[in-house]
Each structure stands twice: as C-alpha cells, then as structure tokens.
From Swiss-Prot:
The modification O-(pantetheine 4'-phosphoryl)serine is found at S36. SUPFAM superfamilies: ACP-like. 4'-phosphopantetheine is transferred from CoA to a specific serine of apo-ACP by AcpS. This modification is essential for activity because fatty acids are bound in thioester linkage to the sulfhydryl of the prosthetic group. Pfam families: PP-binding. Belongs to the acyl carrier protein (ACP) family. Residues 1-76 form the Carrier domain. The keyword Transferase does not apply. This is Acyl carrier protein.
Length: 77
C-alpha cells in the first residue's frame, strides 16, 4: 500500500467518511466535516502509524489531505 493509500485509509477510518470523499485537495474541516477533536485524534493516529511526533504548530498547518501526505514525505526524508 502506498503512503497516499495509507493516509487516506486512516482518514476514512478516523473521520468516518466515504473513501470517495477523500482526495489530496479535501479540506478536513470544510470537505470532511472534521472538528478539533477529530483532528487531534487523527494527528495522534498518524504519529503512531508513522513513528514520529507532529508538533502542535505543524499540526495547525495540516489543513488538507495533501498537506498531510507532503508533511509525512518530508519527515520520512
């Protein structure tokens, strides 16, 4: 499974949305109807899955699915 597929799968599971709604341009708040608790839980799940900590400052910048994918790619080097 690719990184993109892993991230999308986590988002579908954490936010309870349909996979067809999730693409790189999807905004967590505007398109996927996530609230702050949803986003906190999503960040925690991503940290656990990819074995690194996401700072609060970085987390605030992750507004779309694509933002998360790009961030993880950068962190993985």
């Amino acid at each position: 499974m690719s990184l993109e597929d892993d991230v999308k799968s986590i988002i579908v599971e954490q936010l309870g949305v349909d996979a067809s709604e999730v693409n790189e341009n999807s905004s967590f708040i505007e398109d996927l109807n996530a609230d702050s608790l949803d986003l906190t839980e999503l960040i925690m799940t991503l940290e656990e899955k990819f074995n690194f900590e996401i700072s609060e400052q970085d987390a605030e910048q992750l507004r779309t699915v694509g933002d998360v994918i790009t961030y993880i790619k950068t962190r993985q080097g």
